[in-house]
Amino acid sequence: MKKLIQTIFCISSLFIYKPVIAEPQGLLETIHKHKFLTSTIPDNGDVNPYAVIVSQVTKGQLKQGDILIDNFNNISNLQGTGTTIVLYRPSTKETKLFAKIPQDLKDCPGGVGLTTAMTILKSGWLIVGSFPSKDGTTKTKGDGCLLVLDANGQHVTTWSGPLINGPWGNIASIDQGDSETLFISMAGFDVPSPEVIDPVTKFPIIKHEAKILRLEISETDDQVPMIKSQTIIADGFSQRADLANFLLGPTGLAIGDDETLYVTDGLDNEITAIPHAKTRTKSEGKGELITKDGLLAWPLAMVITDKGHLIVCNGKNGQVVEIDPINKKQIYAHWLNANQAQSPPGNGNLFGIAMASDKKGFYYVEDDINSLRIATP
């Protein structure tokens, strides 16, 4: 009987003391692998990968799941002079040039320097931003434009005008069947040369003229997309010329299921929210503060997960940060690039980011070695 009681006690103890494994609060806690996929340098020597997007369509040169990366610098490493888009196909591990746009394109004010503003419409048309420079600084910047390419990488038309000035950050979008709504940060308004110094900070002066532009686009498979309307839905974001980074301004844009637009402001080290982004008729200013400082260190490009969390690349270190925007909570920081050659480690190495097709991981670029990588569980 005594042995039976002891046996029962031991068995019950196993159940009592069995460890409970907590469910991950978000995506980053599940990420454990970082894999190199390809170099992002094409034959012409362009460097400094910026935008990363995943094709959701199969058309022309594009297959669903293809990754496209653009370059901001030319072979001389001058910022605002990159003209190429590279395609990587995960299914075959093939890397090839998708598009090369003439640097002195006449209908783009100032020429071509491809930025983080890039997206593929469901009809296969690609939109990419240009914020050009002649000498690699804002001293010789042009207003730039939005370039429309077909699914074979050919330039077909250019969008420019008074509301398009320095298209800079991620393009967030809402699909509506025969039309699409795009949200793009415009960071070029009133930005001076980096030689214009604030006497107090001893850094280039900070302006607060960056804006978020909403574009309503008509699209079909066969007709070149056209702009139906343009509306400034947010303004007052900080921007500053910078010799090392060309420009500091609002870079990350992501749209939630409730049509709230989230925006990163690197100079103010914060993320804000613009409610009713699809339907609002006037500017919300900088919007509602979601989170500031903490794990953020110059937040740049940003994506949104299936759970509605934001994944943000830090510019001042090699970390990404996960944020619950509804509860305004910073959840987790994860190292993607801990290169000790920079201080802090990974400083300036991260920029573009895109969710993988299975939503379990994400693609990102490393500027220090001009590469595309994937982060997975």
PLM ranges: what are they?
Residues 72-74, 130-133, 141, 185-189, ...:
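Short loop/turn segments immediately following the C-termini of beta-strands
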Residues 24-45, 91-112, 148-167, 218, ...:
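Surface-exposed loop and turn segments in beta-propeller and other repeat-based domains
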Residues 88-92, 215-225, 274-282, 323-330, ...:
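Short loop/turn segments immediately following beta-strands, especially the blade-tip
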Residues 266-270, 291-337:
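Loop/turn-rich, solvent-exposed surfaces of beta-rich toroidal or solenoidal domains
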Residues 81-82, 141-145, 196-202, 206-209, ...:
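A detector of repeated loop/turn-to-beta-strand junctions in beta-rich toroidal repeat architectures
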Residues 41-65, 80-82, 102-126, 131-133, ...:
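Beta-rich, blade/repeat-based domains predominating
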Residues 77, 85, 135, 146, ...:
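Structural signal for beta-propeller blades
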Residues 82-91, 141-153, 206-218:
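Beta-propeller blade signature
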